[in-house]
Every structure is written in structure tokens, then in C-alpha cells.
UniProtKB/Swiss-Prot annotation:
Pathway: Protein modification; protein lipoylation via endogenous pathway; protein N(6)-(lipoyl)lysine from octanoyl-[acyl-carrier-protein]: step 1/2. Its EC number is 2.3.1.181. It catalyses: octanoyl-[ACP] + L-lysyl-[protein] = N(6)-octanoyl-L-lysyl-[protein] + holo-[ACP] + H(+). CDD domains: LipB. This is Octanoyltransferase. The gene is lipB. Substrate binds at residues 76-83, 143-145, 156-158. GO terms for biological process: protein modification process. InterPro entries: aa-tRNA-synth_II/BPL/LPL, BPL_LPL_catalytic, Octanoyltransferase, Octanoyltransferase_CS. Its main location: cytoplasm. GO terms for molecular function: lipoyl(octanoyl) transferase activity. It comes from Solibacter usitatus (strain Ellin6076). The lineage of its organism: Bacteria, Pseudomonadati, Acidobacteriota, Terriglobia, Bryobacterales. The active site is at 174 (acyl-thioester intermediate).
Length: 220
């Protein structure tokens, strides 16, 4: 069993969280840091993946500014997505050489951890063939977009817990016309801390981690 450091960052702006990811990823590549799982919540922000299309952003700068939504192009996979209050965001910084050198298996493992977490609340979630993310019927409840460099991961997932879904009106989520949903919209009331704790348990089981709290850990 390997060690993974859990860092709960609370509500943090996208740029600051990205800086933390980049610092940890650089240290992980150098072998001076352990694997990490960052759990957090963002203020309103729309991000565009490296393969994204601007036409899936349905609002101009003036509209986004009035709505209080920041915009960031990123190097993660996927298209356009929204992050905001009430959404559990997870950024694993992992060296997949210590697990499986298979990005597809990694994404499926993240999806499974989310599916199992939702199952704890009686929500029957699953996958849609050839699409990334976690779905309840035809509605997306969690988005996944990752980045790998020398087999070290960054970026990750966003699970709609009590997200205000009206903010998705400004985008075509992940470039798909399918609707979105949240745990709250499905009648489940839960705090981000509680959902994060349950996710962490499933994440640790699937990746065979012992989760250790703290700001930073040397590589095990």
C-alpha cells in the first residue's frame, strides 16, 4: 500500500489551485513529493480544455463579467466546463508509473470512485459508452478532464453536489448537448466535506492508497 497525502483547500480561486498543482506535479516528477489528492471548491469559473472549442462558450466577456464568472484556458483534456460553489473538485497529483501506465484505466478509476460515492447516497450513476464522466441516466453529474506529463497527473474531476445548475447555461458542457444534474437536484442533501470524505475512502480503496493528512509529504 502506497501513501497519498490528502490536502483539503476549501474554496480557492482557480489560478491559485493551478499553481499548487503545478508545484506538486513538478516535485512529484523529481521524486521529492508523495502522491497527493487535492479536494476543493472554486468560485465561479469556466475553463476550456486544450482540445476545446470556443463556440461551446455561449457568453461573451461582458456577460461573464456581469455574472461574476472568470475564464481560464487550461492544458487539461476535454472541452469547456464550469466550476463553482457547491461543486466538489478533486485534483489528484499521482505518478502513474507506481500504479498503471494507462490513462484510460486512470480515468475509469476516477469515474468508479465517483460512481461508488454516489451509490453511498442511493444515486444509481454510471458511464455512457465513448463519453467521459459520470452520468445519472442521460444527465451528467460529474465531469473529468486530466493532464499527464511524464506519467504524473494533474487536473481531475468536478462532482455537482449542490451546484447552482443555472450557471451551465453559459456553456455547452464538455461540448455535449446533454443536460447536467446534481446530488441536490436528485433530492440528496449533503455537505462538500461529507461527500469529499466518502470519495476519499473509495479513491484510496481503488488506488490502494493509505491516505495521510498534511500540507506536504516526502515521497514514500
Amino acid at each position: 500500500m502506497r501513501n497519498c497525502c490528502l490536502r483539503q483547500l476549501g474554496r480557492i480561486d482557480y489560478a491559485s489551485a493551478l499553481e499548487i498543482q503545478e508545484q506538486l506535479a513538478a516535485s512529484r516528477k523529481q521524486g521529492t513529493a508523495a502522491d497527493h489528492l487535492l479536494l476543493l471548491e472554486h468560485p465561479h469559473v469556466i475553463t476550456l480544455g486544450r482540445n476545446g472549442h470556443l463556440e461551446n462558450l455561449l457568453a461573451g466577456d461582458d456577460i461573464l463579467e456581469r455574472a461574476g464568472i472568470a475564464f481560464f484556458p487550461t492544458n487539461r483534456g476535454g472541452d469547456v466546463t464550469y466550476h463553482g460553489p457547491g461543486q466538489l473538485v478533486g485534483y489528484p497529483i499521482l505518478d502513474l508509473r507506481d500504479w498503471k501506465r494507462d490513462v484510460g484505466a486512470y480515468v475509469r478509476a476516477l469515474e468508479q470512485a465517483i460512481i461508488d460515492t454516489l451509490g453511498d447516497y442511493g444515486i444509481e450513476a454510471g458511464r455512457i459508452p465513448k463519453l467521459t464522466g459520470v452520468w445519472v441516466g442521460e444527465r451528467k453529474i460529474a465531469a473529468i478532464g486530466v493532464h499527464l506529463s511524464r506519467w504524473v497527473t494533474s487536473h481531475g474531476f468536478a462532482l455537482n453536489v449542490s451546484t447552482d445548475l443555472s450557471y451551465f447555461q453559459y456553456i455547452v458542457p464538455c461540448g455535449l448537448t446533454k443536460p447536467v444534474t446534481s446530488m441536490a437536484a436528485l433530492g440528496v442533501r449533503a455537505s462538500l466535506d461529507e461527500v469529499g470524505e466518502r470519495f476519499t475512502r473509495h479513491f484510496a480503496r481503488i488506488f490502494d492508497f493509505e491516505m495521510l493528512p498534511g500540507a506536504s509529504l516526502a515521497a514514500a
